[in-house]
């Protein structure tokens, strides 16, 4: 993402090859597309929310998009550059399950203290419910954000301290694939659980 060149510099390309799961060709294609969509080289939270919202026309994706943006913006400068975007995309689209879960944990851990509180989980789950609108039919025990949060905590909070450690989060998700679908808000969650 930048005005100067339509191709990544060889040293940047090499670095991104090692940091991501993308081939050189894929990285160049993503870079070319990002120049077209974002000539400034940086995506603001408002621009990101607008783009993200296009994928969820029947709901309000703005709150969830803000959480995704915060997690993509690894240097915390309030914008996403190509490196941040492509590294996050690599984890979320091609990473191993544990990498994806660690990434998701960092999004849910709003205050960055290494734990997900019930309130943090509720904030994210509420944002997901607003994003999907009425498109997804939820089972009765997940019919509200509060109920879904309670269900996740019942299944994951093994030491019952009211917060999820990264180990509880990862183990809980790995031991019950329906939780992964719940966390990712997979529309098939209701039919496969």
From Swiss-Prot:
Superkingdom as given in the UniProt entry: Eukaryota
Matches recorded under InterPro entries: EF-hand-dom_pair (IPR011992), EF_Hand_1_Ca_BS (IPR018247), EF_hand_dom (IPR002048), Recoverin (IPR028846)
Residues binding Ca(2+) 3: 157, 159, 161, 163, 168
GO molecular function, one term: calcium ion binding
Residues annotated as signal peptide: none
Xref: PROSITE patterns: EF_HAND_1 (PS00018), EF_HAND_2 (PS50222)
Pfam families: EF-hand_7 (PF13499)
Domain EF-hand: 40-58, 60-95, 96-131, 144-179
SMART domains with a match to the protein in the record: EFh (SM00054)
Record PANTHER family: CALCIUM BINDING PROTEINS, NEUROCALCIN HOMOLOG
Additional free-text comment from the UniProt record: Probably binds two or three calcium ions.
Family statement: Belongs to the recoverin family.
Name of the featured protein: Neurocalcin
The organism's taxonomic lineage, starting at the top: Eukaryota, Metazoa, Spiralia, Lophotrochozoa, Mollusca
């Amino acid at each position: 993402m930048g005005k100067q060149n339509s191709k990544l510099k060889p040293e940047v390309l090499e670095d991104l090859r090692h940091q991501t799961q993308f081939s050189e060709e894929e990285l160049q294609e993503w870079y070319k597309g990002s120049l077209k969509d974002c000539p400034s080289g940086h995506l603001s939270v408002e621009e990101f929310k607008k783009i993200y919202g296009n994928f969820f026309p029947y709901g309000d994706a703005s709150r969830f998009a803000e959480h995704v943006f915060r997690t993509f913006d690894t240097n915390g400068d309030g914008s996403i550059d190509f490196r941040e975007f492509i590294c996050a995309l690599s984890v979320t689209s091609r990473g191993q399950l544990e990498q994806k879960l660690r990434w998701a944990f960092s999004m849910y851990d709003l205050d960055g203290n290494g734990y997900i509180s019930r309130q943090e989980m509720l904030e994210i789950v509420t944002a997901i419910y607003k994003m999907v609108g009425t498109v997804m039919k939820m089972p009765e025990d997940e019919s509200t954000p509060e109920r879904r949060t309670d269900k996740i905590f019942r299944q994951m909070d093994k030491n019952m301290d009211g917060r999820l450690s990264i180990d509880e989060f990862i183990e809980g998700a790995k031991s019950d694939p329906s939780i992964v679908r719940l966390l990712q808000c997979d529309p098939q969650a209701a039919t496969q659980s």
